[in-house]
Swiss-Prot record:
Species whose genome carries this gene: Xenopus tropicalis
One annotated GO molecular function: ubiquitin-protein transferase activity
UniProt keyword Cytoplasm, yes or no: yes
Classification lineage: Eukaryota, Metazoa, Chordata, Craniata, Vertebrata
Gene3D superfamilies given in the database record: Apoptosis, Tumor Necrosis Factor Receptor Associated Protein 2, Chain A (2.60.210.10), Zinc/RING finger domain, C3HC4 (zinc finger) (3.30.40.10)
Recorded domain comment: The coiled coil domain mediates homo- and hetero-oligomerization.
Protein name (record): TNF receptor-associated factor 6
């Protein structure tokens, strides 16, 4: 006899109904059946007694689709902890209990009277539902499994969502490690200057206050670490504005530190007058004033001698005329000494200015020599590339920001040679503005010829093949460089022998690469874009031996 059709009897006269009632009671007492474990009723493996009463049906995708007989009429999902009513309807345990408590003691389907103690577990339906196959709910996973094994699968599924412990965002399990160590804005990094650990998103704020970061002096453009800058401003910077050292005597001039000596020389007399005026004011302020009492000739009592105690006090607190005269004499001697010191300092300043001018001339000569050597070194380095040149464009994000703000971005690389001897070339990169017609937001890349050391030895125009690439800097995966190959066109001015330092005519691609494509791969790494240029000229392909040339045989042994 099927449990699905049993109906408990309240009159005790129907033996079949009584049997069904007994079986229902047995099912209510013991939910184990056919050797199933207590965890069979829940994919999570929890015993039935621990299942929360407010959990609705299984909201998963079945394969094949779920039959309607296994759907809960209340939540319209697969039955969870299926129970059956005396009227033969199935519900999720949590759904029907909530319905009875909220809507009254009746069946939601046919409004038959229904009490909580009349519900009994439908283990047959429960076992059938747990045996149905479902699709993994994780996006990207194509596996299917029985419903009873879903929770176990989710524990090991590489597509299941897991939370990043650093930024609390959810990611597929297979990409979590890459996110934590390469992409997470909260991943830990170390300051390259002071080695302090911080989150990546805090790096910008730290860089603005890092005591060991290099900063540029706003006056002389010298690069120093931040903690040295206050001392540099107050003592060393030759361009920093400072007040005259005689500002306490009244000089209000301000000048750059390297102009202080000239100012002291030009205003020596003025400074001396200021000092003399200050000292005279000080001297007059200490000149003794009359402490004689006011005498009224109409009052004879004023001529009476004062009591001895009053005279003593008066003499104690009043400086004598001799003391004031001595102090004035001392002040005059001090003025004479300071005037002599000013004269000596004036001579010293003149000597220092002469020495400084000599040193400045020498420094300028050294700068010119260093600049020449630097240019020569750059020229030698450009000759060593042998036709393969890699251009490192630093601070590329700032260039992108300028482009977004409609500010033109055009930069040229340093020159390089195709060989030794060889043609001298350079690259030009242009970020097209968002408002540009037909090429908005594109990277334009061109090649220009330059005047080189071997131009008189080379055939013109330049002929050969040029390969331009923007390098993919990804690690651990197959790199996908953005690459274009072009052949030179001798009839164009771009490949003729240049008559100026850099040929204004270039040859290349206006729409070499869209800026959005930079985000698809790691073309920009550490704020740096790498552009590669490989040039193969016809000189590299032609044999140096002239056609028809016959090598001379040896003269033989003597």
């Amino acid at each position: 006899m099927s449990i699905l059709n049993c109906r408990p009897s309240f009159d005790g006269v129907d033996t079949d109904d009584a049997c069904c009632g007994a079986m229902a009671s047995a099912c209510c007492v013991n939910t184990k059946e056919d050797g199933e474990s207590p965890s069979a009723g829940s994919p999570s493996g929890t015993p039935q007694s621990l299942v929360l009463e407010d959990v609705q049906g299984y909201d998963v995708e079945f394969d094949p689709p779920l039959e309607s007989k296994y759907e809960c009429p209340i939540c319209l999902m697969a039955l969870r902890e299926a129970v059956q009513t005396p009227c033969g309807h199935r519900f999720c345990k949590a759904c029907i209990l909530k319905s009875i408590r909220d809507a009254g003691h009746k069946c939601p389907v046919d409004n038959e009277s229904l009490m909580e103690n009349q519900l009994f577990p439908d283990n047959f339906a429960k076992r059938e539902i747990l045996s149905l196959r479902v699709k993994c709910p994780s996006q990207g996973c194509t596996e299917t499994m029985e419903l009873r094994h879903l929770e176990r699968h989710l524990v090991r599924c590489d597509f299941a969502g897991v939370e990043c412990s650093q930024c609390q965002s959810s990611f597929p399990k297979y990409s979590l490690q890459k996110h934590k160590f390469e992409e997470c804005p909260r991943r830990q990094i170390f300051c390259e200057n002071c080695a302090v650990a911080m989150a990546l998103e805090d790096k910008l704020n730290h860089d603005q206050t890092c005591p060991l970061a290099y900063v540029t002096c706003e006056y002389c453009q010298t690069n120093l670490i931040r903690e040295q800058m206050p001392a540099h401003y107050s003592m060393d910077c030759t361009m920093a504005p400072i007040p005259c050292m005689y500002y306490e005597f009244g000089c209000t001039e301000k000048m750059q530190r390297n102009d202080l000596a000239r100012h002291l020389q030009e205003f020596t007399q003025a400074h001396m007058r200021m000092m003399a005026q200050t000292l005279r004011s000080f001297s007059s302020s200490v000149t003794p004033t009359s402490h004689m009492p006011d005498i009224s000739f109409c009052d004879p009592s004023q001529f009476e001698p004062a009591p001895p105690s009053v005279a003593t006090v008066h003499s104690t607190h009043t400086p004598s005329q001799n003391d004031c005269t001595q102090e004035t004499r001392n002040l005059r001697e001090t003025i004479e000494q300071l005037e002599g010191r000013l004269v000596r300092q004036d001579h010293q300043i003149r000597e220092l200015i002469a020495k400084m001018e000599t040193q400045c001339t020498y420094v300028n000569e050294l700068k010119h020599t260093i600049r020449s050597l630097d240019n020569r070194l750059g020229e030698m380095e450009s000759q060593q590339c042998s036709g393969i040149f890699i251009w490192r464009i630093n601070n590329f994000n700032s260039l992108l920001k300028n482009q977004e703000e409609e500010r033109p971005v055009v930069i040229h690389s340093q020159g390089f040679y195709t060989g030794k001897p060889g043609y001298k070339l350079c690259l030009r990169l242009h970020l097209q503005l968002p408002s540009a017609q037909r090429c908005a937001n594109y990277i334009s890349l061109f090649v220009h010829t330059m005047q080189g050391e071997y131009d008189s030895l080379l055939p013109w125009p330049l002929q050969g093949t040029i390969r331009l690439s923007i390098l993919d800097q990804s690690e651990g995966v197959a790199m996908q460089d953005q690459e274009e190959v072009m052949d030179t066109k001798p009839e164009l001015l771009a490949f003729q022998r240049p008559t100026v330092a850099r040929n204004p005519k270039g040859f290349g691609y206006v729409t070499f690469m869209h800026l959005q494509a930079l985000k698809q791969r790691q073309y920009v790494k550490n704020d740096t874009l790498l552009v590669r240029c490989s040039v193969t000229t016809h000189l590299d392909l032609i044999s140096p031996r002239r056609e028809g040339f016959q090598p001379r045989s040896g003269d033989g042994a003597l």
